[in-house]
Amino acid sequence: MRLSSASARIVIAALACLMAAMCKRAPATPAGAPSTPTVRVFVVTSLAGALEPCGCVKDMLGGIDHAAAFIRSRRESASSSLVLAAGPTLFMDPALKAEQRSQTLWKAEAIAASLADAKLVAWTPGVNDWAAGPDELARLRQATGAPLLAANLSGQTGGAESVKIVEAQGHKLGIVGIAVPLESDKAPAGVEVADAKAALEAAKQKLDAGGARIRIALLAMPRGAAMRMIESVSGYQLVIVGKAVDRGEVNDAPTPPTLVGETLVVQTPNHLQGVAVVDLFVRGDDMRFQDGSGLARAEKRETLRRRLEDLDRLISEAERPGSSVRPEDLEARRKDREAVKRDIEQNGVPEPPAAGSFFRYELEPVRESLGADAAVGERMKGYYKRVNDHNRTAFADRKPAPVPAGKSAYLGADKCVSCHGEEHKFWQSTNHSRAYGPLETQEKQFNLDCVGCHVTGYDKPGGSTVTHVSGLTNIQCEVCHGPASRHAEAPNDKSLILRAPPKSLCASECHHPPHVGKDWNVEQAWPRILGPGHGG
């Protein structure tokens, strides 16, 4: 059927109006239950200088190469994605140890470059990030390839900005950073800290003016203060909370996600133990995201998943030859594992809301099983080699402190064997006798972060140093029994040696979190170091 000229003009006019309307706003995602998120947000908080985990158990949590591999693999199944970080990122502590400044800066460089590889979009700093000074922070910020956001800071901020607006699938997302980098109520030198709430409210107006309808806040501040602020400032669909400051190697437990009004609040465990994934599904024009995860059940699922991981590890340990676990206890753990699996199935992810936009949340533990990003892995190897080559020379003259009068020096197992042959033979069958080898194969034997747990008498009078380890490599007799020079001279004087070290020594000296899993048990590990002539 042909259209009259008048009808044709009406149709053309209608099409023109429709096209104009489409140009004025982002295309809406069709109604229904989409399987592909409009935007996938990868979240890392309080990475705090953790390049990879350090310990003596398999498949530990952490590793920037594993996190990068995970992000790369999951990015492919989303329409668009962002990587965001908040809290201390580059350094483990608020201050650098003078002797470790070079290797700590090189580690920060490796972290910054790896974040760039992961396509970091924005990050907000914690106190630790000023550890090397504002100039180094500015240099490392450039290495990440992403802006540093801190709307409430001025002065020596390392080049921080207030907001960033990005576009994803036709939607503008506005990101603001708020940092409260205070340690003992003091900010880093030259940094002025303005009111966080006022800055967050002002940033929202700035984001609105820029056309952002999805608003994300990166907060680096104490969680309690962050939660109180979120309760009083509306308009942000996603808030990512990182710590204000972090110290040392201790790993935090996961913090469950929560809703404050219509705002999803997310915080991942420190040291890159996990990466949170927040999927935003946009349907229609409503940018209020409903809970598509069932957060109450999500918390229970996460608890169950951690329990399942613990049981898998315990069962694997118990199934090894020579295990001291009784068969009935092993069977009980297997039954527990099946029960936990059933509970996980019963607490599965619910169906999405029937209409409107919604989010889904998950926390992915970062483990070896995720694989390793090749480029990041090579960078890590380069970092370790650089440190090894540097420290071998820089600390070549570092010798152990002299032994005070009336005290014992370390002799080494080669001297102990002359009287304790049976014990020495058994020791050679244990992992303790091979502790130094992995450092050599991985070029970490001169790394100040590593060597202390792999040698005997480290940094003790008459013991070893990072470069002076002759005769004292590996975990030898004197780690547990104490230095033995006076014992060798007077073997009948039982007061000169610790004959039966307490089990607590294992945990206090070496086997403590995060170097072992939280389920590590000295009672189960103890039998592995007992044998002929050695308590067995």
Regions found by a protein language model. Name each.
Residues M1-V11:
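Bacterial N-terminal signal peptides that target proteins for export
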Residues A6, A21-M22:
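Intrinsically disordered, low-complexity regions enriched in serine, threonine, proline
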Residues V11-A21:
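Bacterial N-terminal signal peptides
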Residues L18, G62, A118-K119, A143, ...:
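Generic structural microfeature
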Residues A21, D65, A113, V121-A122, ...:
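Active-site-proximal helix/loop capping residues that flank conserved catalytic or ligand/cofactor
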Residues C23-Y383:
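Acidic, metal/ion-coordinating pockets
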Residues P30-T38, L47, L148, R297-L314, ...:
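Short sequence/structural segments immediately N-terminal
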